[in-house]
Amino acid sequence: MDVNFLLSALPEPYAAFRPIVDVMPAIPVFFLLLAFVWQASVGFR
């Protein structure tokens, strides 16, 4: 998808939240890493 289309699709009142919206697709990856770190801390039981 075109980046300009994604940025223009966000309504103006929500322009302040644009950086958060840009990070949102990576959140599931953080949960995957969190699960790995958690299992490493408990010794992969």
Curated annotation (Swiss-Prot):
The protein's assembly and partners: PSII is composed of 1 copy each of membrane proteins PsbA, PsbB, PsbC, PsbD, PsbE, PsbF, PsbH, PsbI, PsbJ, PsbK, PsbL, PsbM, PsbT, PsbX, PsbY, PsbZ, Psb30/Ycf12, at least 3 peripheral proteins of the oxygen-evolving complex and a large number of cofactors. It forms dimeric complexes.
Family: Belongs to the PsbK family.
Transmembrane intervals: 20-40
GO annotation, biological process: photosynthesis
Membrane topology: Single-pass membrane protein
NCBIfam families tied to this protein: PRK02553.1
Signal peptide: none
Propeptide segment residues: 1-8
Keyword NADP carried by entry: no
A Pfam family that the UniProt record links to this protein: PsbK
Superkingdom of the source species: Eukaryota
Compartments in which it is found: Plastid, Chloroplast thylakoid membrane
Disulfide bonds: none
RNA-binding as UniProt keyword: no
Record's keyword terms, sorted: Chloroplast, Membrane, Photosynthesis, Photosystem II, Plastid, Reaction center, Thylakoid, Transmembrane, Transmembrane helix
Role according to the record: One of the components of the core complex of photosystem II (PSII). PSII is a light-driven water:plastoquinone oxidoreductase that uses light energy to abstract electrons from H(2)O, generating O(2) and a proton gradient subsequently used for ATP formation. It consists of a core antenna complex that captures photons, and an electron transfer chain that converts photonic excitation into a charge separation.
Protein name: Photosystem II reaction center protein K
GO cellular component terms, A-Z: chloroplast thylakoid membrane; photosystem II reaction center
